[in-house]
Structures are given as C-alpha cells and as structure tokens.
C-alpha cells in the first residue's frame, strides 16, 4: 500500500514519539558508539552529495560522522543549496554559515573546502576514514585513488566504476561480500540499484534466460537545459522539452553483483522531463513456467524478508510523484506485472533515482563502518 512506503522525516511526514525509557536507551547506544564513528568526507556537493547528507542526517545511531565537504561553491552555495531544494523542499534542519570555512547542520559543524584536485584536499590532517566520491569524475582507480594519496583510508564511488577490479555492491543483493581490505568500492548506479534486487528474486525463483530493460529516467545534470554541444548528440538536446533516448549500462552492470546473469541482460534509457523518480520496465524469458500472481508473491516474500527496506511491492495505482523520497531502492508496480505464454515476464518498478539511491549510499557506508569497528 502507498501508506506503507517509508518517508523521510524531513519531507514533512510525522515522526512517532518514543517513551522516555526508549529515548534513554537510544542515547546510551549513541554514547557507546560515538567514539567508534568513522570520519566521512563528501567530495562533490551536487545532487547525490546533498541527498546523501540529508539521508545521513535523518539516521539514528549512525556509525558515520560527516566532518568535511569539498564543494567548489564555498560555504554560501553549500549552505543555501542544502537548505533549499527545488525537488526535496526546504530542509527542516537548522543550516547556518559558521565562518568562511564551516557550516553547521543542527549545531553539527562541517568543514567546507574547495579544490578541484583531490591531491590537494586535507584528508590526512583531518583523519578522514571514508570519502563519498560524488562528482562523477573520479570513478576509476587512478582518480579515486587520489583521495587515498591525500590521506583518506577508503573511497566509496557513487557511480559505476570504470575499472572492472573495483568491487561493486548493491545493498540487498551482495553487500555481504564486502571485505574491509577493499580501498575503493562502487555503489553502482541508481538504475542498477533498482533493477538488481528484483532481478535477483526472478533469478532465484524462476531462472532468467535473457531479457531487456528500458528505464524511463528523469533528466539529470549531465543533460542540457537548451540545445548545446554534448558528446552524446541526443543529450545535447533540451532536457525539459524532449524524450531523449540514450545509453545505460545498468542492465549489463547487474552481472557485477549477480555473476550468473553475465551476458543475459541489456537495455536503454529514455530521459524524460521530470526532475526525479524513474521507472524500469524489464522483460525477461524465464526457465520455470509461471504466472503474474506467482511472480508478485515472490516479490512480496522478498519485501517482507531479506530485502525489507530495499524492495517494496505497491498495489495502489500510483504515478511517479507518489514515489518521490521513498527510501526503498525499488517499488514493484504489482498491477503491471504480466506473464505471456507462461515464460515471458514483464515487471515495472519505480525508484527515486536521487533519494532512494542516496539511502543506499548511506547503507553501504554503514557496511564499511561496521567492518571498521568490528
């Protein structure tokens, strides 16, 4: 049901009250863990960087301590764009400029630095444990490795990695394979985070022979507001005026977290004039004969079990805006599940390509933190 979808506290939904006993217990947990938190820096304070900070701020008992942000715009831009967001609305937190190199979020001070060269960042002197790499630029071993050269211990790339030997993780699918010795990891793409969980269910329950995917995806900052030069001639066209066919590696990338599917999936993207929330349309041939109700039952079992909080099954006839700021990686539109000839399965799944993805970045960062303090 729509009412069951998890919403963040700072999108306007009510927060349930806790008893005094529970509140004291929660504070005790925080006190115990405080000295064990890892120090986190965000490199690139764009859409994912700011969504990540809001998601992190909404967590309780987190093992992450965000202490620095590298943003070329400085404190004025960082504080203003964090507080006021055209998609997310006004941040309920108290965001202030402390001085020319610090902002505060509900009293929590965060240092703002500005350098386009990761080698010049003060990660060593700040004892940074983990860098959230959110620029979309430093996504290979050489680029991301510059953060480690600058003194950070680890890097989490918020995009598909360019080097095959950088491990990729999708929470709900293969995060259990994470090892503390990995210096650089990738959280894959937002579309892979939507696709991989329910594809895993299909593979385990029915066996996938082959398939294709189309993601109808909200426009992103990589596109042009008006027609202008771009390496992709379709993305060169005005994003708010067109449906823009383009490439996506999301389907192929599923095999990075589900090796049994290597060579079995492919797909394309259609960029559309909406600011956030996208939808995947997957068609696969399966080995085991099935029917729509059985497919949805498999999704419900996963949503109530091992993929709780990552996968959601929606029965109401909703539209894209209804999925804005949903915490899950993927919301199956149950009424649109189809089976043709008992072995061709069509699944439609919604996802907030900014918010839901950023929640998984926080989750994966927490996975690394738990290995640190174990």
Curated annotation (Swiss-Prot):
CDD domains in the record: GAPDH_I_C, GAPDH_I_N
Active site, renumbered: 190
EC number(s) reported in the record: 1.2.1.13
GO MF, one annotated term: kinase binding
Subcellular location: Plastid, Chloroplast
SUPFAM superfamilies membership: Glyceraldehyde-3-phosphate dehydrogenase-like, C-terminal domain, NAD(P)-binding Rossmann-fold domains
UniProt-annotated binding residues for NADP(+): 47-48, 71, 116, 353
GO cellular component: chloroplast; supramolecular complex
Main location: plastid
GO biological process, one term: reductive pentose-phosphate cycle
Site (Activates thiol group during catalysis): 217
SMART domains in UniProt: Gp_dh_N
Binding annotation for D-glyceraldehyde 3-phosphate: 189-191, 220, 235, 248-249, 271
Catalytic activity reported: D-glyceraldehyde 3-phosphate + phosphate + NADP(+) = (2R)-3-phospho-glyceroyl phosphate + NADPH + H(+)
Disulfides per UniProt: 55-325
Similarity annotation: Belongs to the glyceraldehyde-3-phosphate dehydrogenase family.
NCBIfam families found in the cross-reference section: GAPDH-I
Name of the protein in question: Glyceraldehyde-3-phosphate dehydrogenase A, chloroplastic
């Amino acid at each position: 049901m729509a009412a069951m979808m998890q919403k963040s506290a700072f999108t306007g939904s009510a927060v349930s009250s806790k008893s005094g006993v529970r509140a004291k217990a929660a504070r005790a947990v925080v006190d115990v863990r405080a000295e064990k938190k890892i120090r986190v820096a965000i490199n690139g304070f764009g859409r994912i960087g700011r969504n990540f900070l809001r998601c992190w701020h909404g967590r309780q008992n987190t093992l992450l301590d965000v202490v620095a942000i590298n943003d070329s715009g400085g404190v004025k831009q960082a504080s203003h764009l964090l507080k006021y967001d055209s998609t997310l609305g006004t941040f309920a937190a108290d965001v202030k400029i402390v001085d020319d190199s610090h902002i505060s979020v509900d009293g929590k001070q965060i240092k703002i630095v500005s350098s386009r060269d990761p080698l010049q960042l003060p990660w060593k002197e700040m004892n940074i444990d983990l860098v959230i790499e959110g620029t979309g630029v430093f996504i290979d071993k050489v680029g991301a490795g510059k953060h480690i050269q600058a003194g950070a211990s680890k890097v989490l790339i918020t995009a598909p990695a360019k080097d095959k030997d950088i491990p990729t993780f999708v929470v709900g699918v293969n995060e259990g394979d994470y090892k503390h010795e990995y210096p650089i990891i990738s959280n894959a793409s937002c579309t892979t985070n939507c696709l991989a969980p329910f594809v895993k269910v299909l593979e385990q329950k029915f066996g996938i022979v082959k398939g294709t995917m189309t993601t109808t995806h909200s426009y992103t900052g990589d596109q042009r507001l008006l027609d202008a030069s771009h390496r992709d001639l379709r993305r060169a066209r005005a994003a708010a005026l067109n449906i823009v066919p383009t490439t996506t590696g999301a389907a192929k990338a599923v095999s990075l977290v589900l090796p049994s599917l290597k060579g079995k999936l492919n797909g394309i993207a259609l960029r559309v004039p909406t600011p956030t929330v996208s939808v995947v349309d997957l068609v696969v041939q399966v080995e085991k004969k099935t029917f729509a109700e059985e497919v949805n039952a498999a999704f419900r079992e996963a949503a109530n079990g091992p993929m709780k909080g990552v996968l959601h099954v929606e029965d109401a006839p909703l539209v894209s805006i209804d999925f804005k700021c949903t915490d899950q990686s993927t919301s199956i539109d149950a009424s649109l599940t189809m089976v043709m000839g008992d072995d061709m399965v069509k699944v439609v799944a919604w996802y907030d390509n900014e918010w839901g993805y950023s929640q998984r970045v926080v989750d994966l960062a927490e996975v690394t933190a738990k290995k640190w303090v174990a």
